[in-house]
Amino acid sequence: MSALITHDRSTPVTGSLVPYIETPAPAPLQTQQVAGELKDKNGGVSSQGVQLPAPLAVVASQVTEGQQQEITKLLESVTRGTAGSQLISNYVSVLTNFTLASPDTFEIELGKLVSNLEEVRKDIKIADIQRLHEQNMKKIEENQEKIKETEENAKQVKKSGMASKIFGWLIAIASVVIGAIMVASGVGAVAGAMMIASGVIGMANMAVKQAAEDGLISQEAMQVLGPILTAIEVALTVVSTVMTFGGSALKCLADIGAKLGANTASLAAKGAEFSAKVAQISTGISNTVGSAVTKLGGSFGSLTMSHVIRTGSQATQVAVGVGSGITQTINNKKQADLQHNNADLALNKADMAALQSIIDRLKEELSHLSESHRQVMELIFQMINAKGDMLHNLAGRPHTV
C-alpha cells in the first residue's frame, strides 16, 4: 500500500510547513473462537470455561434405503391383521423419509403417531365392547322369550294338574259310592268293600299330594310315600275289578291300556279341548251313569240287579279312568316342557354371565389403555418442555465468557 504525502500540515513548534506522511492503520488481528474456549491475557486458548456437548451423529444422519426396507418389513410383521395397520403404514414414510435434522420435528411426529395408535386401540376395544353388548342384548331377548314360554307352560301345567286332581277325586269318590251301593244291595259285599278301600286310599293319596304342594310334607317324604300310596290304590282297584267282573275284566283292562298307548299322541293333541270341558264332564258323569242304568234297566228288565250295577259301575270307572289317563298324560308332557324351558333359561343365564365377565375385562383393559396413553403423552410433553428449556438456556448464554 502506498503512502500519501501532503504539505498542508504545520508543526506546533515552528509553525512551518513540513511534509506529513499518512500511512493506513493496520488491520485488527481476527481470530476464530470456538464455543467453550477462553483466551488468557497472552492470547492463548485456555482449557477451562463453558463446554457445550457435541451434537449427536444421528442428527445429521439419514435413513438409507436398506434400513427403510427393514423398518417397513418389521412394521408389517407387527401390524399385520390389526385395525391400525393402515394408519401405521401412513406414518412409516413420515418417520423414515424426512431428514432427522430437527429433533423437535421428530418428537412432534412421534407424539402424533403414538396418540393415533392409542386412539386406534381404544376404537378396537370399544368395538369389542359394543359387539359383546349386542350379543348380551340378544341373549336377554332370548331369555325374555324363554321366560314367557316358561310362564305359559307353568300355567298350562297348573291347569292340567288341576284337571288331574279333579279326575283323581272323581275316581276315588266313584269307587267309594259304587262300593257302598254294592255292599248295601248285597250284590258283592267283598268286591264293594275292596272298591271302598280303593276309593279311600285314592282320596288319601290326593290329600297327601295336596299337602305336599302346600309345603306341609317334605319332598323327601313324598318320594317314599307317594309311590307306596299309588301302588296300593292301583292294586286295590285291579283286585276289586277282577272280583266284580270276573276274568273278562283283565281282558278289558288290557284292551283299554292298549288303546291308551296307541292313542296317546292324539289324546295329548286333544288335551287342551278336553281340559276345557273337564268341568262339564265331571258334572255330567252322575247324570250319564244314572240315565245309562235306567235305560239298561228298561231295556233289559229280565236282567238281574247285579248285572245292572256291574254295568253301571264299569261304565263309570271306564269313563273316569280314560279321563284321568288323558289328563295325566297331558300333565306329564307339560311338566317335561317346563323342565326343558327351565334348562334353556339356566343355560342362557350362564352365557350372559360369561359375556358380562368378558365385557368387564374389556372395560378394565380400556381403562388401563387410557392410563398408559395419558402417561405416554405426559412423557412426550415433558421431553418437549425439557428440550424447549434447554434451547432457551442456550439462547440466553453469552457468546463469550
From Swiss-Prot:
Topology of this chain in the membrane: Multi-pass membrane protein
Protein's cellular compartments: Secreted; Host membrane
Coiled-coil positions: 129-160, 345-379
Sorted UniProt keywords: Coiled coil, Host membrane, Membrane, Plasmid, Secreted, Transmembrane, Transmembrane helix, Virulence
Intrachain S-S bonds: none
InterPro entries linked to this entry: BipB-like_C
Phenotype of gene-disrupted mutants: Mutant displays reduced virulence in a mouse model system. Although the mutation abolishes all YopB/SctE synthesis, it does not interfere with either type III secretion or type III targeting. Deletion mutant cannot form channels in liposomes. Mutant can secrete YopE during a HeLa cell infection but it is unable to translocate YopE into the HeLa cell.
Transmembrane annotation, as ranges: 166-186, 225-245
Any one Gene Ontology cellular component term annotated for this protein: extracellular region
Family: Belongs to the SctE/SipB/YopB family.
Subunit structure, as described in the record: The core secretion machinery of the T3SS is composed of approximately 20 different proteins, including cytoplasmic components, a base, an export apparatus and a needle. This subunit is involved in the formation of a pore, called the translocon, in host membrane. Interacts with YopD/SctB. Together with YopD/SctB, forms a multimeric integral membrane complex with a mass of between 500 and 700 kDa.
Purpose of the protein: Component of the type III secretion system (T3SS), also called injectisome, which is used to inject bacterial effector proteins into eukaryotic host cells. YopB/SctE and YopD/SctB are inserted into the host membrane where they form a pore and allow the translocation of effector proteins into the cytosol of target cells. Is an essential virulence determinant. Required for YopE translocation. Essential for the establishment of Yersinia infections in a mouse model system, but not for the targeting of effector Yops. May modulate the host's immune response at a distance from the site of infection.
Name listed for the protein in its UniProt record: Type 3 secretion system translocon protein SctE
Species per Swiss-Prot/TrEMBL record: Yersinia enterocolitica
